Each structure stands twice: as structure tokens, then as C-alpha cells.
């Protein structure tokens, strides 16, 4: 279905825009409109009319701002914006690694213990007769699945590892952020049986809606655990200490707004409210004035950037946190805040009347609900002095439903009821992670923030409702909560039940303005109930997508002949790949992508004095050409090397020629023949595919080669390597190394296949670079030098042919449709984020002096961004 860049007559009539506005818009369009825009939808092209910005400043300003000046006051324009706007919600998930996964033998023992194994008697006999004997199925080959709504992705399998490192990234679309949940499952791949579940993690998307990047360790729960993750909504007001004057303290203020999934079977619903602002009036309709045994309590602690626990408070009643909130002074820069929720539950009595077990609430499984008990005797906090004492408060209220003999009789443990046992193991909660550094064996595990002191102190048995606060000098202060009475569990027959624990990073809290956050409460992991941890990087993005006509001035400015705005953005942005992706899709949709790529590559060639390093960096030009090849060249790639990749996957022949990696019994000469055979087939397939290469790609390569010959007329190698650096180093070779990422195969290759693909790609890369293998680096590859030398001329001939554009070239095809307004919304967001950096670049004296045209173009950009800001605010309200 064809798209239109302007509001048609039916749309105008539908929203009843005033006649004078229509007339003025038509007058403006008649002055500056020319047939310009080719909008592509698959292989179909239609020509539309779009306003072209004139060189006359008055006409440009009128064309850019007429929509705002004439239509903003109109209610019809507001309704048009609000009704036609959409939201583009995406989630980027990077799965780094897992640690401390359960061995297969331990999982099998647990299945036997729970009676879930089909061969229970046989497994029991094996465990008794030879407990240390590991069978073939006892190895753990973990992989991770990522599921969101109907989308499901998976990582490659890492064989025989309990601490696998995947480092794979996935892009997921979200249709309903309010209810969507990200579900990650760590699986154990089995060759002769169904894959086994190791652990699971559920992350509600609403906890990521602040759109801030998170890199954390998350605890895995048992595979059968519920998807209903306990959550609390907290309103923060945060002022950090002054960096210039440390004597000026800051403050942290928080209040609970709402609780979700805190209990699965409560006789009385949890009190909840929705406060408009910190310290404002609150409604008491949903607030219970009587405490019950199901009402949760909150422990919280604050960790400084020095690693000290500067605040540690326990036993704050839910209603106090809900109505009054907590305010504390800060004398240190803080790193994170930990919240722990728990509640009282009746103890379970054995048949003889003694307390002998702990009963799950109303038959629910504690692990399934993400809960467990707080250990009653934790180790002392390392930040508290040995002579620290705890002040006590006088009780002022009692529980609403004390235990009666009848209720005790109802809670007597039966053989069918599940029991819980407390543990002194430290709670494992999400922890922050600095950037990891690569080593020869992969990136080293990150140094996580150790919250053991905070966790131990908040997990301790709370007596008489005392609250401990530790200042920066580690002196213990006592604060009393006079409005709350916390009952004595030993006296009243109650004990503490752990609901969950979560962490808020100080960097995720807005400074000096109220902001609310949803916090997931993750389960306690004990020695008997530990499934491992997984490290993730999460980034949720939500873009308000306005109607296409709202972005028309921005599109016109981006497509100006001089490309000043794009050049300026490319200099300052750190997200070149994302910017390049949006630019390529916008210009491809409007039929001007080749002009964009030629301008960017010409500029980079002109600014590079050394031909040996041309296109070696990740600039806006290289990223744009790279993404353009993937945008329209995937069918060509699949047709050229796809069948060979499938044969290599199914082949059991080894190509390993590195003596240090040979398996026992392998013949290096035989492996070398296998490798040479695959390399010859792959090279032949690529060199003979030149006529199948899409015409737009060949036009880009022709432009690059012509410019290189003009810039370096005496260089005989760069004219070939400049092109092969794209078609081989950024297209064919990466696809050979990772076929799944290029949709060539549904799964990642195995270990032996991966090694074969690596050696094939190495040989092709040297052939494309016109370089032989050396004696000092990877000297085991020297046997491939004869093949490289023999095919250098064939490679040159292929590059020369590829850089010509005959009339019968195939056009290329898009794998997915391009939605122009969505791509422009992303570009608008990039420009907003880089607005200040772009202004500083314009004023910088270190760079080349800016021309008047560049200054005028930047001024127009600021006006357009301000106009779009108003539209986005209007659409969001």
C-alpha cells in the first residue's frame, strides 16, 4: 500500500481544518514544491511531491514554521496529532554470560528427590553404586533463550561450561509495554533427549520504562517459577551532595506508591495508593488502618561509592512508607539503594505441638512465587563495629489477627504440605557491573558491587522495630519509628517471610525532581535453592512517532545537497551504527541512498592522507556502506554462499591445522586438504557471482574505486582493497563466521564447524587484502599461501568487474518494509540528544572555521527540533 508524505484531502476534511489554513498551506507549497521524492516499497517506486527548502531564507523559514504558527492554536491540529501519533517501543537485550549454573548430576538428584524422574529407581541405584561416575548426559551444554510476547531468540550453545560466555545481542519489538514480560531461560542442550531447564528469569517491561541502560547480574529462579514477579513502585526525590562543597549535604526521599504481586493468597488485599507527588495529600480509601500478618515491612540500605553502608534501616511498616515516606540526609556520594520486603507468617507446628517446620503460605511454593525466609542468624555486618548495639522502641499496636488454637490446628503440618528451611547463605540480587575488558579467554568477569553487608543487615531478625542508621564515619545512630509496632514473632507465633529484594542505582534516579520507578523484587537464593546468575545489558526505548507530515521540514533539511546536518551529526555522535541505520533506511525509502553514500565515502577518501588506513575505522561512511549491503544484499549473500554453509554444517570433516588445537588421532595434512577444498569452493562461488550482485551495490563500489583512483593515482593496491574491504571484510567474511546473524542458518554452528568457518574466513580475508600469511603470526596458515598467490589476479579481476554497472543488474530487495516516519522519529531523537554537542562543535575554535551556510543550516535545525519538541509534548499529553 503506497504511503503519502502529505495530508490528503480526505484527511483534511476529516479533521475539519479551517479553509484559511488550507489556502495558506497550498500557497506555500506552490512556491517551493517540486517532484523530488521516490518512495520505495519493495520493488515498487512511486513519485510524490514534497516541499524543497529554497535558498531564500524567508521561504525556508515560512515552509518550516508555517505548520506551527498557523495550526498549533487549533484544536483540530491537536486532535490530528494525538489521533495519528503512534509509539515505537523496542528492547535491546545483550546476554553476556551466566555463572554458577547447576551441574547436570545435581539437577538429576533433585529430580529424583522430588519424584519427577521417569527412571527414579535406576537413577537411585546409580547414585548409590557409583556416585562419582559421570555419564554422557551429565555434562552441561548451556544456551539461553530470550522470549518477549511472540518473539523468541536463542544464543549459541557453549559445551561443557557452568560459566558460559555468550555475548549476543537481540532486538525485540514491544506492542504493550504495560503488560509485556521478558522471559529468559537458561537451557541445557541434550543430544539424545529433550533439552533440560536450568533456570529462568522474568523481567516486567514496566520496570525498564525510564529508558536508561542497565548492565546487571540477575539471579535465576527455578524453571517452574511463576511469571508474576513481585514489584513495588517507589517515588524518589534525590539531591546528591555538592561536589564543590562537600560540607553541603544532600538528601534522599522516597515513598511507596503501589505494590504488585507481593502475595498470591492474601485474606486482606495489600494497601495501595497512587500519590501525585512527594509529600502531597494522599487518599486513604485503599489504606488499611489495621496491620495484619499479611502486611509487608520494608528494610532499606544505602551504599556509598566508597563501598560503605551509610544508611541501614529495618522494619519500616508498609503504611508508614505509603503515607509518610522516608527522608534521610546524605553526607556521601551514593552508588545504590537496596530494598527488602518481608512479612510475618504463622509458624507451623508438628503433631507433638513443637515448632518443627516452616509452612508455605496457603500451599504455594516459595520458590515458585519468588520468595523465601530471611535467615534468623546472619553473619554480622562488616561495616558495623563489634560494640554496636541496637536501640529498641516501645510497641504501640498489635497484630489484627493473633493466632488462636483453632488457627494453629489448621496450620499443622501434614505429609502433603511443603516445608521451607532457612539458610544463612547470602542473598543474590542484581548487581551493577562496570565495563569488562577483553582477555585471551574472552572478557573477564566484571567486578560486581558486593552488597553482603547491606543484605546481611537487612536480612537479620528484627526485634522490637528498631531502625539502625550508619553514617559515613560508621557510627551507629538509632531512629525510632514511634508510629509502628512490630510484633515479637517468638511471642506471637509468627516468623519473617522473605518476599523479595531489589536494587535501585543512584545513576537511574533523576536529580532534584520527583520521579517514580517500578522495582522488581527477586527471590533469595540459598544453598539448597540456587540456580545461578545471568549478566544482562538492557535498554528499553520508546519513541513517539508523529504523523509523517510533521517530519517533513526535518526530512527536507537532511536531504539538502550539502548534507551539512548529517556531516555535523557524524562528527559528534557516539552511536554511529544506530544513526547510520536510520539514515540509510530514510534515504533508501526516499530514493536518495546512493547520493548519500557517495557523499560520505568521497568525504572520507578526501580526508584520509594514508591510503593504507582508508575505511579501516568505524566512521559514519563505513557504517553506512556496511548497513546498506545488509539492507539490500542478504538475498545475494544467501544465494552465493548459503548452500556451501549448509554443507559445511552437515560435514563431519575437520579442517583444523593449528597443531596446538588438534584433537587426538587427527592428521594435520588430511585436515589441510579438507580446508583447501572448502576454500576453493567458497572462492569459486563468490568470484562467479558477480552478475548476481545488486546494481545499487555495484554503483557504490564503482564510486569508491573511481574516487580512490583519483585520490591516489600511483597506488596500485588501494583501488582493490578499498572495495574488497567492504564486500569481503564487512560482508562475506562476517557471514561465514556467524551464519545465524545473517539468516543463512537457523542455529549457531558447533565447535568443529565454527573452527572450520574461522579458517575459511581467514584465508579469504588475506586473499581480499592481497597479502600472504606471515611466518610470525599464525604460521600454521602458511600452507594456504600458494592458494592465495595463485588467486590474487582472479580477485583483482572480480573487484574490477564488480565496480562496473551494466544495464541488466538485479535491483536488490529489502528484507522488511521501511516505515519512514518511524525512522525519522529515531533521527529526531538522535539530534535532540546531540544538540548540545553539535552546538559546541559549531563554536569550537580547534576545528575548521564554519561557513555561513553551515551556520544557517544549524540555525534551521534548531528551529525544526524546537517545533518537533512541541509536537511530541502535545502528542504525549
From Swiss-Prot:
Keyword Ribonucleoprotein appears in the UniProt entry: no
Induction: Up-regulated by P.aeruginosa, PAO1 strain and PA14 strain infection.
Biased composition, class Low complexity, residue ranges: 389-409, 426-438, 447-456
Domain C2: 72-218
Matches recorded under InterPro entries: C2_dom, C2_domain_sf, Ras_GTPase, RasGAP_CS, RasGAP_dom, Rho_GTPase_activation_prot
Coiled-coil boundaries: 820-848
Gene Ontology CC: centrosome; cytosol; leading edge membrane
Swiss-Prot/TrEMBL GO biological process terms: negative regulation of Ras protein signal transduction; response to calcium ion
Listed SMART domains: C2, RasGAP
Keywords assigned: Coiled coil, GTPase activation
One Pfam family cited in the UniProt record for this chain: C2
Residue(s) at site: Arginine finger: 616
Region called Disordered, residue ranges: 350-456
Domain (Ras-GAP): residue spans on this chain: 591-802
Tree of life domain: Eukaryota
GO molecular function: GTPase activator activity; phospholipid binding
Polar residues bias spans: 410-425
Disulphide-bonded residues: none
Annotated function: May function as a Ras GTPase-activating protein.
PANTHER family referenced in this protein's UniProt entry, alphabetically: RAS GTPASE-ACTIVATING PROTEIN RASKOL (PTHR10194:SF60), RAS GTPASE-ACTIVATING PROTEINS (PTHR10194)
Protein name (record): Probable Ras GTPase-activating-like protein ngap
Species per Swiss-Prot/TrEMBL record: Dictyostelium discoideum
Gene responsible for this protein: ngap
